[in-house]
């Protein structure tokens, strides 16, 4: 503390005290100050000056930590008032002083004057006159006018009973200092982020101070919210080593705040560290430190900063651009996007989980946009390993994922949003940093109506904010708002941060589950128009729906239309997509994907798919597809109330000659009439063997003529398997894959995997016999290439009875199935294809010996009803079936009882 001030303020060697100048850095007590010089390329030197001939009371002192024999000492009477009197007069101001005496220990005594010369106020005299200091009379010399004046001023103060000389001893002037706070978090919360008057008593470094809170005299250490400046590292020997610019940052804060009157907003208290913002009439020290390159923004405390985090980011950005101090080596990331690609307006077409959306640009291009700097809900810890055998569905099985997706879906689907690209996350390989491979991601801030969607999601506790390395600039342009939103969500216990039991969504996926679909079908059919959400679009007419009321997922086929089919992986190889199948699927996606719709369930096919009409905002999707020349009317629509509308829409599309009708040429009416009259019912009966009858009265049959080929193939295949048995458990079944399966009789048969519930439960379909079974994967093996479906196609073909309707009543349907099983199971019959169905060919079946029609027999026995066809060439058969139905009705047989 005895280091010299700069040369211009050095004392001369003359006998008379030389007048020196400096700036008051700190007031130690009522009779001691620290002065400093002007900075020259760094913090300036400083020295302590004690006022000559007077003594003020000693301030309170805390016991030395680690020394149990020391204890706290309180203020002496009027000591704090003397310190405050002098602090308010001289702190931060220029003073001139003389050094009259210097002790062997290096303590300097002298006179201090406010201003640039001795004409200014004598600080010692002012203190004595106010009764805040006593004169040391033992050293007074009568021939010294300044000392005599001090004595006169003291006498006047005594007679006026000022300060130390007042009655009562001054006990009321002793502060009740509080060095510790029992519960800092409660203390901070009790202030409700209101400004508190304070005096900065000590500066630890650029962003940490010790403050005296008024009027209750709490001494607290406060770290500035949102920033971190270079610090002093404590070494093993107790010394401190400053980081680059640590001393400069400390001086910057000291010169502006030390012993100044300020207001402090105490904002948070994580881990017993009090975070706050210091308000001074001349500016915000937090922003100034950033702007001058003495500090950097820190995310962990930025969230609690109450004065606008964007100001801090802007100040830091300014320092980076100017490359000042800690940013002298800063290299800005290169921008690789044009302005038009950085900001654009797009329409939201799909929400992907809870952190990404698919948008349609003005150019018609589709683009996936990930919300910047947020992470969707995910499974943590033991939940990841729970129920490994269960099919994992992230949307329903991850807590709050469904709520997050629904929030985005309801807010965004079909609406235009503003997209500001923040950064592009490069693609990662699976080997990098032990993380899964990800493609390149465009990360952006998405707003609608001025609302930041990511921030809204985080504020509801439906997503969390990603934490970055401090030097990682690839983050949201509104990162601080995201952190603040997360802090609010945590404080209010929202969503993921709630202590309540997590919501569970028990959603039954009955798509492809025939038995389950049968259970739901009566309820959906009776419900009439039901609300649904389109979860997925497989093709123009095939969708997956979520039924909120029934909490189930169903596969849905549009009724009344014939839509082009997309490419499919078939047993004989990849089936090429039909023309305009992609356009039809895109049309359906744009119109209904993830929208709320209404459906009317009419029927169900053998595979458990529901055949229905779908409406969205008053638009019938079947009609819309036909109207846009992306589908044709199917004959099954004839029985529907929408038939006329569909025919009209198709005629309109034909006239426009668009898409499916581009090559359509209208033929003369006469020719059409002749063709209609000429068409007759086909009579090509083929001998076949019925193998398996389903609950929906469909059946699987083998062509008798190819039976020998199948027998030869099976014999050869089993011989090869016997010679080279498959390794048990080596086959990993996948849905849709062909394999061989060991049936209950111990023999191997060709099969197709329909569903994998777990290794112990694999659903297979025997492609040559039409039956199904659930068995362990240990009873499955890869299908030898020599016996694939290319060598011999699947021999079991699915058919349905023509001209009949299966009863909806389960008991009646079971009776009909039993009757058919008794009559035709494993029996050779003659099969004739009458017309095409939605799922499979519709046929009549005759007994090979008697030529009796099996379906007609069911009608005669009152087991089934007649399906009335409108085609003219079928009317003879329809009439025969209707006559049989009338006979059954008259006799009140079975369903007509």
UniProtKB/Swiss-Prot annotation:
Transmembrane region positions? Answer: none
Q: Give one GO biological process term.
A: mRNA catabolic process
Q: Name one GO cellular component term.
A: nucleus
Query: Which residue range or ranges hold the TNase-like domain?
Result: 18-167, 194-329, 342-499, 528-663
Which coarse location class applies to the principal site listed for this UniProt protein? cytoplasm
Q: Name one GO molecular function term.
A: nuclease activity
Give the keywords, sorted: Cytoplasm, Repeat
| Claim: Repeat is one of the keywords in the record | yes
Domain named Tudor is located at 732-790
Localized where?
Answer: Cytoplasm
**Does the keyword section mention Repeat?**
yes
Domain of life, per the record?
A: Eukaryota
Specify the protein name. Staphylococcal nuclease domain-containing protein 1
